Structure formats: structure tokens, C-alpha cells
Amino acid sequence: PQDLKYSGEDSFLEIGNFNTFRENVTISKGTKDGGMTTSIKDNNLFMTGVHIAHDCKINNNNIFVNQVTLGGHVNILDNVVIGGLSAVIQFVTIGSYSMIGGMSGIDKNVLPFSLAIGNRAKLRGLNLVGIRRNNFNKDEIKKRNSIHESFINRKIELSTNDKVEAIFYEYKSILNEELGHIQK
């Protein structure tokens, strides 16, 4: 593992089924501070030169375009696309069905269904392309757009935790799983 605290203890890399690793992909094993395991679930595509640091958790059906770099302890949920030459700082979670534009620097959690672009990346709206590709119907898209707009464009000044609580209360039925990774 590429962690200065690593002192030779047994650590692991778990890789699921149907993943594709192109040329020069590097993946670091886990460390003591991250449960000793880096894990990659199923059906992910890692294009040329991708780097996955220690203790990352990568779920299913994700695409990492050329030269994407993940810092340690990053969580990538399901159906995420990260554009080429993008970097994600350590301890960040990227929500399901999100898309990160190429050459972006991600230094904060990214909400599910979001489109984030830039250095430092900003949320630019709903990832409609990804949502449509995954066969969400019009009502589901409307609900997610409403949630996204509520979170991003709240007129009242609230802390992030207060925003999350308010939105959970308002849209509880579909948010439990989709935003459950954001901790108070």
C-alpha cells in the first residue's frame, strides 16, 4: 500500500467478477486504518493508467476513463462514470448514477444522480444522460430532479447536515438508500 503508516502487516485486495483492467492500472491493497482491504465489486471498467489507492471501496457497473486517480479511502457507489484525467481526494464518496466531467478535481462528496465538473468540481445539475441510460421513468426522473434542486438551490442558509436532514424528511421514501452514505 502507498501509505507511510504501512508496516508490512497482511492486507488485501478483493476483486469481484467481470471487471476489465486496461494497460497500466495500479491498485493498492488496504491498510490497518481502512480495515486492511481495498475492494472492487463487479462489472467495472478501468481504462489506461487508472490508479486506485489503498482502502477504496468500489461498487458495481462503474467506468473510470483514462488516468483517473482515486486517493485513499474513497467510496464509489454504483453506475458512476469518472471522466479522464480526474482526481478524487481521499475520504470522498461519489454517489450512484453520478458523472464526473473530464479533468475534474473532486474534493467533496458527490450526491447521487449528479453531474460534477471542474477543478474544484461543482455540481452542475442532474446526470440526465446516466439516468436515462439506466431506464428510469419520467416520474422517477422528476422526483430525483426535485430532490437535487432542493439540495442544491435551497434559499435558506443551512449547514450541509441540516440540508440533508430536511431533504430526508421531505423525500424519505426514495432517499434512504440513495443518500444513506452521507454521515451526520
Question: Which stretches of residues belong to each language-model region?
Answer:
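Terminal amphipathic alpha-helical/low-complexity segments used for targeting or macromolecular assembly
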Residues: K5-Y6, F12, F18, F113, ...
